Amino acid sequence: MPAQYGHPASSTRAKGLSRPLVPLALAFCLGIVLEERLGLGPAAWMLVVGVCLVGAGAARWSGPHGLVLPLLVLGFGCLGAEAMAGALFGYPANHLSRLPEVWLDAPLPLEGWVVGPPDPRPADSRDLADPARTRFVVEVTRLGFEEGWVPTTGQARLTVLGEVGEVAYGDEVRGSFRLRRPRRFDNPGGFDYPRYLATQGIALEGWTRDPVEMLGASRGSPVLAAIFRLRALLLRRLDGAMPAPEAALLKATILGDRSGLTPEMNQAFLDSGTYHILAISGLNVSLLAGALFGLFRLLRASPRIAAFASMLLVTLYAGLAGAGPSVVRAAVMSDTYLLAVVLDRRADLLNSLALSALGLLWWNPRDLSDVGFQLTYLATLGIVLGLPRCDRVLAGVPRLLRISPSREKTSSRQSGPCPR
């Protein structure tokens, strides 16, 4: 892709303000970490942000001008801390996370609406005690107590054991669930399940064997509802077009739906070390973005129109794939790069990477502690910084002895997350 079409600057020697978003993004991340450790609350950080903005404005107009950038970086760090403080302390009194322990682990009526596509799981043919189940995340709007219904906020991850009717995004549901706080296993250094759910805004888990009442479909975004309806249609078409094993694999690798995978299939992928093939990640999204851009250019669309159309379709695909965290991250990163082409700006990959990180962390600062988020950005950073160095090292090597470009990218990607 020619440079005027937003080709990334291959050199990483840019200095000064050529990449202004990189120090701002790093400061934002540092602020998130500091607030998580110190727990000062949003008011203190906003006070410092105000001081930094006033100081930067004064330095800009009357000097010393050298203080403008440091004050802006400090201000962005405090904005990151304030965003994290809001995520930690910004819950209202009626939030699910504040529900007293006395109401947990006992049947409690609730109402809410489904905020994402459901995750149905078939019964385990090897274990009669493992019934079919449907799991979905609900934005709880009311809890039922002896005194009556009480308005509530917060999300819960609910599981209905046994057969349940069709559940879709935006559906309002009512049922009696046993709620509990997410539990962490005691394995040292093991997976922190409560923290993982917290990054997704989920405060409680719940389950029931009782029927769940559907109250209608009147919540949520009409656009998302249409995308998820299209996703459900595609899943049904795949089921009807081919046998179960093949359909299950296609649904998992293309649309992110693993509900059709049997326990035997899951175990086979785990035993072979290839389970990651089933996960939709940045590779899928970047290949799609590149293919779409190339297709539109072949159709003689201008670079800006091709990039804009590719952005729309990549965003649509993220929804069709279930809008999981990894897919959304990859879509945001691809769209950020394509946006530079739309704006007719020379795309610098480090700046694009920093901008996407700022957007994601502003929306949900808890993502910074998510291992998937960290690995995604470290691997991408490894590619951005590693490929130019690989090219320079291999410049003097005869062509027949060089490694393929795909292996260069693989080595660079793996070097990013490697411990030093």
Segments and roles (model prediction):
Residues 2-15, 70-276:
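Membrane-interface helix/helix-cap signal primarily in integral membrane proteins
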Residues 16-60, 370-373, 377:
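Membrane-embedded alpha-helical segments of integral membrane proteins
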Residues 28, 34, 57-60, 80, ...:
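Hydrophobic membrane-targeting signal helices
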Residues 41-47, 61-74, 302-304:
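Membrane-interfacial entry segments at the cytosolic side of transmembrane helices
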